[in-house]
Every structure is written in structure tokens, then in C-alpha cells.
């Protein structure tokens, strides 16, 4: 079976490097499905789930946004923050979401609102992954 090499890299570490059957990433225009021999492209990522499918199963990684570079035999995902789905802490995510909502309610500066909206978007994407994982386990 044909494979494609995938690297997922954050600002602090390499989270994944290996041969996969396919990878799905949250592009700014919608979910991007990448298979071996894919056409070369460069796309912006929004906060969400990167799903890596191998012959052993599926691995999920949260990315806070970033860039995906696709070549026919290599996919590289760069993100400031990348966290394995199993390492997401629901309590911390809920705290961050509440903090962002409180800041939105109390802020009048448009720059503050913009940054707070980004933080809220990241928290919501993380919660969506946590809830999806919980659904898989039941």
C-alpha cells in the first residue's frame, strides 16, 4: 500500500514523523485530505484536529493553526502549538475558555477583542477534540 511521509512540528518539538496512509488537516478553507502523490500545495491551518491514518490506526493531534506544506511524497505541518489529543487537559481548556469569554465581555479595545476571539477559538477547537475522543471511548 502506498504511503506518504508526514512531519508535525511545533515551536518546541517534533510531535510526529513517519509514513502514513493519509492525513487530514483543518485548512482555513475546510478540511484538507492528503494522500500519497498529492499535488503540491501550501495552505494556512486554523485551530483544530490533524488526523493521521496509519495501518495501525488513527492518531489525532491538536494544532493551534499554522501552515501545511504538501509535496507528492512529504507533508510538513508547522504549528506554534501542537498537542497530542490524549494530552489535552479538559479542566485547563475549560478554564481558558471561561477566561476568554470573561475578557470578551469586559473588553472595549478592538485589538484585545481580536486576540481574545483567537484564544476562544482555540479553546473551542480543543473542547471539540476532547468531546470527539470521549465519544469514541463510549
Swiss-Prot record:
It is found in: Cell inner membrane. Its main location: membrane. One of its GO terms (molecular function) is proton-transporting ATP synthase activity, rotational mechanism. Keywords: ATP synthesis, Cell inner membrane, Cell membrane, CF(1), Hydrogen ion transport, Ion transport, Membrane, Transport. It comes from the Bacteria. HAMAP family: ATP_synth_epsil_bac (MF_00530). This is ATP synthase epsilon chain.
Amino acid at each position: 500500500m502506498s504511503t506518504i511521509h508526514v512531519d508535525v512540528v511545533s515551536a518546541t518539538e517534533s510531535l510526529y514523523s513517519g509514513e502514513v496512509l493519509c492525513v487530514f488537516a483543518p485548512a482555513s478553507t475546510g478540511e484538507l485530505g492528503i494522500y500519497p502523490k498529492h499535488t503540491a500545495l501550501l495552505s494556512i491551518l486554523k485551530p483544530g484536529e490533524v488526523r493521521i491514518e496509519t495501518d495501525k490506526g488513527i492518531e489525532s493531534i491538536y494544532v493551534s493553526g499554522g501552515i501545511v506544506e504538501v509535496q507528492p511524497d512529504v507533508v510538513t505541518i508547522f504549528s506554534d502549538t501542537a498537542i497530542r489529543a490524549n494530552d489535552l487537559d479538559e479542566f485547563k481548556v475549560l478554564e481558558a475558555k471561561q477566561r476568554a469569554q470573561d475578557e470578551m465581555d469586559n473588553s472595549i479595545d478592538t485589538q484585545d477583542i481580536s486576540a481574545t476571539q483567537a484564544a476562544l477559538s482555540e479553546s473551542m477547537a480543543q473542547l471539540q477534540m476532547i468531546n470527539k475522543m470521549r465519544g469514541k471511548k463510549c
